[in-house]
Each structure stands twice: as structure tokens, then as C-alpha cells.
């Protein structure tokens, strides 16, 4: 009987150990398949493989300058580029490592995000919508708050637009736009609140002076505000929601300290990524 108990205890210990090892392996695998895509200060398009801490340049035929990247619902990412000897800018929609479609722009935006139907371009406090049906540009929003943040226009994983709207009284509203139907999520004083970004389940993160600048979260689709993980000044989530990039500090739009965290729990899984010069426009694929 005693030997039987010892055998059962030993078997349980083995199963627990195997489960822990499997958990570690799963986390390692989920990290290894992700890369950061960004345009560096020399207008090169860079892929940074997280597990290997290695940078490689990405090239597409006919393009020599890569100026900006953004989220693309339906693919991996979108990129603003300039063709060789061209006076215009092109938006490249990238899927499975290749150019899926291209659209022409008359200007280079400050921020960009794309869905299957529309491409949103933010510049000088205005959002222009570029139709993927006929490649026409049209003014969509003209009251976007851009004085303090680099995260003024975001896209949820459902393809809906989220942006910061300037109000007449000086306050700023976080607005959800679903096919032209606007919903105010919440309004804040820009002198007291720091916008952070969208996390992996469509919660908008922010820090408020009244809460000692702890990171808070509110769902853009409705829900209670709540505390969220460790402090950060930027969040960019991967498309599958497993990882997020957080930059602890931002200086002139560039991240001076970058680390990778689990997108669901906020637990750091890779820190102190060296030799990175990542602008605010970074996409996790």
C-alpha cells in the first residue's frame, strides 16, 4: 500500500513537470514565430525576429523608400513606400510576405491603418479615407486631436476606426467609428491623461494623473474601466493577440526602451532587446 502511494505521488510529479515544460515550450514557440516590422530612420523596411534578436531588410521590386508601416486587418501589415523615380506614394498591402495590392496616395501620412475595404491616413489633424474599390481619396475626419500623442488613430481587430477627437472646450474624446456611426467611449483632459493605445482585446489603455498615472483600460465596445498591468507609454499588439510591444519611453516619436510582453497577461517574456531603433509605427506579425 505504501509503495502504491509512492508510485502515485511520483506519477503526479512527473505529470506536473511535463505540464510545466509543455507550458514553457508553448510560450517559447509562440514568441519565436513573431517579428517586428518597421521602417527605420534610413527609410529601410526592417523585420526583427524576436527569438533570434536579428534584423533583416525587406525588399519589394520597384520600391526603394519605405516611410511608414501600419496595421492591416486582413493581412500582415500595410506600408507607405515610394517607387523608384516616382513622384507619388504607394500604399502596399502585405499578406504572406508578398504585396497583395497597391494603392496610390498624393501625400505621405503621419499614421496609416488599413482594412479590407478602406485605408485610413492621418495627416495634420485630418483623417483621409482611401477606398480600395476605386483608389479615391476623401476627407473623412477633420477634427482629430494630434497635439500630444502619436496614437491618434487606431484600428480594432474588427476593422473599426478609433480616434481622438478634439472638442470645443479643449477636452479630447476617444471615439469609436463603425461605418460612419460614432460612439463616444470616454472624454478626458489631455493635460491630465496620457493615451497609451489598444491592447489585444480592443481595450484602450491610458494613464491619468488622478490615478497616479497607473495604466488603466476601457473597452472601446463598452465596459467598465479597470487597471491594466505595468506602466507603458505605447502598446502594439500582434494580430493573433499573443504578444504586444511596449515602449517604456518615447522620445521624439522613437522608442528608447522596447520589450515584449504576453499580450493577454502583461507578463514580460523578452526584455532589453538590443540595437533596436524602432519608430512609433511598428507592427507585430
For each predicted feature, which ranges?
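N-terminal Sec-pathway targeting helices
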Residues: 1-15
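An edge-strand/N-cap motif at the start of beta-rich repeat modules
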Residues: 22-61
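Short beta-strand elements that form the blades of beta-propeller/WD-repeat-like
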Residues: 30-40, 73-82, 117-123, 159-165, ...
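Structural motif
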Residues: 42-48, 85-92, 125-129, 169-175, ...
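Repeated scaffold domains used in trafficking and secretory/extracellular systems
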Residues: 63-73, 106-116, 146-157, 190-200, ...
